[in-house]
Amino acid sequence: MNLISIPAFQDNYIWLLANRQKHCVIVDPGESAPVLATLAQGQYVPQAILLTHHHNDHVGGVADLRHHFPDIPVYGPQETAKKGATVIVNDGDSLTIAGQNYTIIAVPGHTLGHIAYYSSPYLFCGDTLFSAGCGRLLEGTPEQMYASIQRLAQLPDETLICCAHEYTLSNLKFAHAILPADQDIATYQQQIEQLRSKNLPSLPVKLQFERKINVFLRCNDIDLQRKIGITSPPDSLVSVFCELRSRKDSF
């Protein structure tokens, strides 16, 4: 399989996953022009569009892509029905597209209907789990978002996180501010600074490594809890998540 990240807007990624026959899926096309250019350059033949949620920077290119490819199915959660989705999918559903199997995982939090698509080893998780971070809670509750990222964290170690924004460096700066002595975070921040200075993507990233450097996946870490002022055992790890998310929102 050939995985391509297509830059869009200021920091979005539209994902394209193609097989050897150059049949491909397009994930979260916020705009059409860079997708059409990539399709033409690589002579890819789109088989489906996958939408994770309803925000315009993820669905804005659907109408024009369907103008160019009228028969292409557009999969998405119920909240994308008015944003171009032609096939509504739900938690636990399975899809087979161009010989590749996809499992739908409900991950509410950023939006109430947000979903992820998992096709081993690829995880297209939209704005739920970022490298070294997680999405803002724009519609859902902290309980929902924490449960969602924990659900994704249970996937196999080799899972490749294909999220929709290049937020890695800013997320690592926050993580380093919380855990300045953490060598994994400090070293990775330096690596990503070099990568981004060359305008290269920091994604995808393996889930096994993400568990080390993503503070939102380390809410049970006692040292982290102390660093954010939680000195006694918390009532629930959601409270740790809430404190981290609040601090990140104002970072």
Swiss-Prot record:
Zn(2+) 1 binds at H53, H55, H110, D127. Its EC number is 3.1.2.6. Zn(2+) 2 binds at D57, H58, D127, H165. Binds 2 Zn(2+) ions per subunit. One of its GO terms (molecular function) is hydroxyacylglutathione hydrolase activity. Monomer. This is Hydroxyacylglutathione hydrolase. The lineage of its organism: Bacteria, Pseudomonadati, Pseudomonadota, Gammaproteobacteria, Enterobacterales.
